[in-house]
Amino acid sequence: MRTFLAVVVTVSVFSGLAAGQGSRPAPKSAEARLQAIEDKDAIHAVMMNYGRTLDARDFAGFAELFARDGEYVAGASSAKGPAAIRELLEGLLKKNAAPLPGRDFHLFFNETIEVNGNEATALSKGGFFVRGADRQLQTSALVNYHDQFVREDGKWKFKRRQLGETAPQPAGEAR
């Protein structure tokens, strides 16, 4: 009887494994894999241009990174649509202007991007660094980014970018 049970269990396990093998999704075509790489590369460029445009105080370029109904959420501040996002950033940085453009900058790391057709999500971390009066670099903020993207008119754009701090920064400072 033990031998019979052992055979039944063994057959059941291997049958289950074999059934699981057959339920795996078919491998993606070379074209689909290439499209995924190109999509992730384009989304990565949007994420990097976020920092580049902020650091250059290029508010028009910054706003163009967002979809027509894109949303930017940074703490208690938020705006929807490129014009409102541009206005928000201009207001924040006029109140909290950097000493000189080019003396502060963003760095991004630990990104993951998941693409699903014409939509995507991404998680990343970033740091905002400034030079003090002594020219030494100081960390102003460390941030978690939670992003949603949409392909709009053939280009990837932020559908929503939400910032969540991982380390304190001085009150009222823009990122």
Positions of predicted regions on the chain:
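Positively charged n-region of N-terminal signal peptides that target proteins for export
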Residues: 1-4
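Short beta-strand edge/turn micro-motifs at domain boundaries
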Residues: 21-22, 119-123, 142-172
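Transmembrane beta-barrel outer-membrane domains
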Residues: 41, 103-104, 138-140
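A solvent-exposed, acidic/Ser-Thr-rich amphipathic alpha-helical stretch
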Residues: 59-127
